[in-house]
Every structure is written in C-alpha cells, then in structure tokens.
Amino acid sequence: MSITRKGLLGLASGGLLAAAVGTTARPAVAATARAPERIGPARRTLIRNADVITLDAQLGELHGTDVLMEGGKIVAIGKALAVDGAEVVDATGMILMPGMVDGHRHIWQSVHSGAIPKISPVINDYINWKMRVDVCYTPEDAYLAQYAGGLLSIDSGVTSVLDFCHTFHSAEAVEQAVKGLRDAGLPGTFAWQLSRHPVFGPGGSATMAQIMTNSGQAPDEDHWRIAEHVRSLFSGDDDLLRFGLASPIYQDAPISRTAETFARIRRLQPHVLAVHYHRSDKPFSDQSLQNVRQMGEAGLLGPDFHIAHGHGMHDVELQMMRDNDSMICATTMGEHSYPFPSVHGRAARAGVKVGIGIDTGVAFTHDYFQHVRGSYYNLFRTDEGKQIALSMSAEDVLNMASGRAAAAIREARAGTISVGKRADVLLLRTDRLDFPVMRALAERVANFSSYSDLDSVWVAGVARKRDGRMVGVDMAALKQKVNAMTERLHAQADTIRLT
C-alpha cells in the first residue's frame, strides 16, 4: 500500500512516525586542519577587511571591516584592528555573514538524498519508504547517517540545527546517533522522538491497520527508558549540542493523552519539546485534540514548545504561541504543495519566534540559500502572504534563516555577528561572473548566493570549511561509505511488505 506525503499529516501525529575585547600579543601559531572527530579548541582568528552582513540591528551592514574570533566567540568588530598572534584571513572583496539555522531537519535522512525527490511521482511513496528503511538501521548505520548529515549541514553553511530524529528504536542506535552528530561538530538540539517499537522488521510484513493502531498509542515504556538514557548523554546547556525530545501529537485522540506525554517529557527537562503539527479542520470536542488553541487552553505551551510546520494555524493560535514564548519552524520548500499555506510570514508578523528548515534531505537540495529564497517565494501563495512579502526587506528574509531562526530553536548564543555571540560565521566569494556588485549586501546574498559561493565556514570559531572544501574530511571516501550503507539499507527495505 502506498501512502502519500499528505498521509503523513495523520501518521506523524502518532508514535511510530512520529565593544571590543583587549588583544594582548601572543606568538603566531601555524594553521592546522583537524579531523572532525578531533575537533580542537577554537583558534584566535582575525577575518580582515570583509563586507559584513551582521543582522545585528545596532550594527547593520559594515564594509571593509575586521572581525576577531577567540575562544569560540566573536570578541571584536572594527576597522583595521591591531591584533597579534592570530591567524589572519584576508577577506577583501568577500561577504561575511552569520551561520544559518535550520529549525526542522531529519538529519538521518540527509544520506538518502534523492530517494524520494519532490519533482517525481515517487514523492507519494515517502511514508512507505520511510517506514521500511527506518527499521533496517543498525547502531553503526545511525552513527554514519548522523555524522554525514551533520557534515552536510556545515558544508552548506548551516551551523545550528534542531534535529527532529524520528527513527532508531534501541538505546544503542540512539546513542550512536548522538555520537555521530556530536563528532560532526554541529551545534543545536538533538530531539529524539518517543514512539513505539515497529510491528515489523527486515523480511517481515504488516498491514496498514496494524501500523495505524500501533502509531496511535502512547510511547511504550522501553522508549521512555531510552529517553532517560539519551538524557544522560548530555551534560547541560553549555554543550554545543543540547538535549531535546520530540513527542507525538495525538490529533483526533483525547487531549489528556498529549497532556500526560508532555508532562512526562518535561520531567526530563529537554531544551526543546518538539512536535510535528498539521492543522486539522475536522469538527472537534473539548476532549479530542484538533488544534493549538486547545493545547494553549490546556496549558501545554511554553518557551520549550516547538512546532514543525503548523501551516494553516489561526491568528488566535499564533497569539497563543507568542504569549507563551513558543516557537515555529516552517519548511517552506516542501510545504508549498500542502493544502494550507506556510505560516512563517503571519507568525513573524504576530511576533512569534519563527524560522525555516529543510525538513528532509530525501526530497530537497542541501543548498540552503535556495530554501532562503523559497521561504520568500512561498509567501505569494495568498493575498495576505503577498502583502507580508512586499513589506519584507532582504535582511528580514535572511533573518528567517539566521537571527530570528536561532531564537526559534532557543539558540540565543548564535544568529548574528555581534560581540559576545558564538563565532558561527560564513565567508562568501563574490568573484562569480554573475554575482552582483550593486545593491545592499543582504540583497545580493538573498537573491543570488548559492552553495558554490560558500568559501569558508567557522563553527564556534573553528574553521570547518576553507577554500570551498571541508577541513580534515575526505568527502569522497565518506560518500563511498554512505553509498554502500544506503544501498544495503534499501535492499533490506525491499524485503518488507506493507499492505
């Protein structure tokens, strides 16, 4: 049986799918490339003479400006800074901007790029594909998928992610998933989704009735034990990668079930409580969960609460999200074909913390600049969205993928080029023949930049990409490992029969 992407709206609600700093002289240090699994402390680095998109409302755009990074943070911004003992990067003619933020990505799916492309009839097979591949993963596969997916994010200029990990059903696999993402050095929040053990495996079969019955129930106790184990893998909010959990949302089920699940999750104190949420227009009772308004009235929202998608939310629901300091991520490229328009424009206008994300690498490009532009074009689906779009500046559009987006995953440490912020920065080349030399910097980047322009990436002050290549990573060898793994996983998935 084939389930469409639209069918995910129901299944995803269940458990299964579910001021400058003083600069004292120091001896010069030779640059050293480190492998990701040995990512060392940030080096003192001076980016010299860059044109800077700060996305800091107090600073704006700066031309011919120096930025000093030390101890993983931005410690000075100014003209012709006098600095000794730092690696100097000549950024003349280049654009420096904050690292980008993805507020909803299934990192593990990044290695399956092209398995279910959006522009293809097979997009309707997404759920069938996901359910079958999901159960074939080993702990070793979980590590490789998360490690490679984390590197792909950094390679594309994404330096913070909310990883909605809706797979892996053993403590060993989830632990390796965390280790892979941590070894990749990608900051953000790892939010593993509580669910239930699948009712089938490689070589097995199941009916959709069995799957639906299983997915509509509360997480099993083994998954709660795994969640407690995952919590033990994180030391606290000072980590680059922080602990989160993702919950099923039981639309059409008693709201008390969601309340009980949320309460138990919050006892584990996740940095983010993430949910997939798709609006339902069915008639509802006070006991049957249908919308965010009910969750708000039940006291389930809060500053840890994060919604992925949320398309079609009503104004009163957006007001509740704002008043509870809750967060939203719109995956605008994928949502363009959804029955209701993406919510990011209206959410931003309402004062909600909102950003954008890719969602899944199986269907969409990792060139995040395309998603930035897609978030703008998506607004033109409706007359209301068009008016919002026409009121936005290029800085507003970039902010939806950086400063505003960072706030929308509770990542206050990043998102702008400001003194004291974490040194997550991107350096873009501008020497491409068709890269414009006129208009504001943000307008040039928002309209014209692409993955090919990305020269360098620093994460917490550590150079992860230089001269267009990842530092200390043999990407060709990694690709061979990934291809071998995905070929095996897909072959195993083909042995599963869903009817």
List where the protein language model places each region:
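A conserved active-site cap/scaffold subdomain adjacent to cofactor or substrate pockets
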Residues: 329-331, 335-339, 343, 350-352, ...
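Alpha-helical scaffold segments that flank or form the walls of functional sites
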Residues: 114-165, 169-187, 222-237, 481-485
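His/Asp/Glu-enriched, well-ordered alpha-helical/loop segment
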Residues: 298-300, 304, 345-432
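Active-site gating loops and adjacent loop-to-helix segments of metal-dependent hydrolytic enzymes
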Residues: 113-142, 197-217, 281-302, 324-327, ...
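Metal-coordinating catalytic core of metallo-dependent amide/deamination hydrolases
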Residues: 36-37, 172-316
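Glycine-enriched alpha-helix->loop->beta-strand junction motifs that scaffold or abut catalytic
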Residues: 267-270, 300-303, 320-329, 349-354
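Active-site microenvironment of metallo-dependent hydrolases
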Residues: 2-65, 70-73, 80, 399-499
